Amino acid sequence: MKFLCVLLLASLAATSLAILNKPEDETHLEAQPTDASAQFIRNLQISNEDLSKEPSISREDLISKEQIVIRSSRQPQSQNPKLPLSILKEKHLRNATLGSEETTEHTPSDASTTEGKLMELGHKIMRNLENTVKETIKYLKSLFSHAFEVVKT
């Protein structure tokens, strides 16, 4: 199956090259040889002739024509990162809620009940989760900080 696909592509390439190399008034189809190997060899010879006619372009010529500028897209980080307004509001509300809950004193009877224990566990879990999220975000920023340093313009 692959061999037939290669033969079909070779035939198509030979036909298109033959049409491109002829003047417009002579565009008519020629009979193709039935021997597949002869046709493939002929296609290779045509492509080699076409390559020898074209001027060679060295890698240095290509690089010298392009202007490559490498600059850092990183901006100096301030102590207080700028966050969208919605995130700031959300943080403020969360801190206010946590602050009000932490300032209320729990009586020993509250701590002995199931609700008091659940509340304390909830606060511990929330603090641990916030610390974990902060550390994870910090780690991800350190991983991807160098990805935006090189910019091609």
Swiss-Prot record:
Specify the protein's topology with respect to the membrane. Answer: Peripheral membrane protein
Any signal peptide, and if so, which residues?
1-18
User: TM spans, by residue?
Assistant: none
Keyword Zinc present in the record's keywords: the answer is: no
The organs and tissues expressing this protein are described as: Highly and specifically expressed in the lactating mammary gland.
What GO MF terms are annotated?
identical protein binding
| Compartments it resides in | Membrane
- Phosphoserine PTM positions read S47, S52, S56, S58, S64
Which key words tag this protein in UniProt? Glycoprotein, Membrane, Phosphoprotein, Signal
InterPro entries named among the record's database cross-references: GLYCAM-1
- Spell out where the chain is glycosylated: T34, S78, N95, T104
| Region: Disordered, residue numbers | 95-115
GO CC terms in record: membrane
Task: Give the family per the record.
Answer: Belongs to the PP3/GlyCAM-1 family.
Under which name does UniProt file this protein?
A: Glycosylation-dependent cell adhesion molecule 1
Record the organism. Bos taurus
Q: Per UniProt, what is the name of the gene that codes for the protein in this document?
A: GLYCAM1
